[in-house]
Amino acid sequence: MRRLCGARIAAVLVQPADAGLAMSETRDHSWIGICLILAVMLQTIPAFSQEVRDQGSNAGEDFFRPPTNLFQLNTQYRTAPGSGPNGTIVNVTTGTIDFRYDHALDLAPMWILALRSDLPVLAKNPFSSDNPDRNYLYGVGDADVQAVLIHDLSQRLAVGFGARLIAPTGGDTFGSGKWQVMPIVGARYALWEISPSSYLEPFLRYDASFAGDPTRKNISNLQIAPTLNIGLPDEWYVSFYPSADIRINFGDPITGQTGRLFLPFDFRVGRKLDDGAALSFELGVPIIKDYPVYNIKTQVRFNQTF
């Protein structure tokens, strides 16, 4: 199309003036107008895509505006019910350091493929016949990889879908013992009326096990995150339900379970330190704990984009 337009415009510029060619000139001038409009459109499409990407640029906290590269160091502390001696229930404490790397690929204007990988290292004090004193044990947890395809419908609205694959690298002590697949779907709606960096970002995941140790519990639960992010002055922000901690369990019951629902109050507060780094703190406490995912959860995240 660009070659055709260029050839047509050149022909108009070099043709001799002739009154008998008035009708032809009119058609040629129309061609010039059409070519100019097409040229503007061709330049605008990638510019619009880049504007959408740049407007949501962040230090890694926005799922639908991923930076090109992200390294995250995530430290987490949580307690949850676990099996104790003689059928009792005890609180098991788990400390996690998660090493995460993300990479985003611009596939086409307004299309992004976001890739992610996680390698958790755990310390926990479960009760077992091999650990009757509940000493802390240390090891690698279940590693995972994730791919999500994101499409910007407009500067305000984006949608995405993908999946996460979790491998049972944590063994009996630090993992589920199961291969898991987790389909993901979500959307993002910018709330510019509040602030330029505010948005509503709900997403759903479904965690399901499909292979692994047959003696371990089968996993099948819906995970919900109705994320609301409020951008604050001086690069601060607060997010409500930033993690998919709302759970509905359809799989085998876990220790202490009396129903299917886990509903916490979960929030995160953070600040961008500079153009490429951010630090945040997250706290989750149960409201409804029929399906006891945790008694308390805290996270400190450091993000570095590059």
Task: Describe each model-derived feature in a short phrase.
Residues 5, 9, 22-34:
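Bacterial N-terminal signal peptides that target proteins for export
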Residues 12:
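N-terminal basic, Ser/Thr-rich segments that initiate or prime the first beta/alpha elements at protein or domain
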Residues 25, 47-48:
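A secondary-structure micro-motif
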Residues 33-44:
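Bacterial N-terminal signal peptides
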Residues 49-212, 218-306:
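Transmembrane beta-barrel domains of Gram-negative outer membranes and organellar outer membranes
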